[in-house]
Amino acid sequence: MKYIAKYLSMPYINVYEVATFYTMYNLSPVGKYFIQVCTTSPCLIRGSDKLVKACKEKISNEMGELSKNGKCSWIEVECLGACVSAPMMQINEDYYEDLDETKTKEILVSLINDKPLKPGSYRGRKNTSPEKFKNIDGDKHA
């Protein structure tokens, strides 16, 4: 960051502010599987605290720490834009949605074993429409 500040002729604090504000910048090493748990209001109301509990149990008690095998790390983040599928988490570039504590633990164990499970809804949702919403073609999707 000091190099970037010097290169851009700006104060170091300005570079630091950007690097610590955006979750896509990491100030310490992350695992092969980087888990971001959404804890904004919609996800929290629907149980994201259970996802955090699962991460603490299966990966590391502290955010940002690597798992014992070094493959996984996790953090809490603000809205990931999939509120209708709450609670959810992003693993690398993929969204895992409609989660509960048990499903989250299964996903985390699969990552620790380097055999990731399929991303998407874990409740059988076919799209991200609200529950019982009918598409313009008349099909109901849950």
Write out the residue ranges for each language-model feature.
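Signature of N-terminal electron-transfer/Fe-S-associated modules in redox systems
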Residues: M1-A142
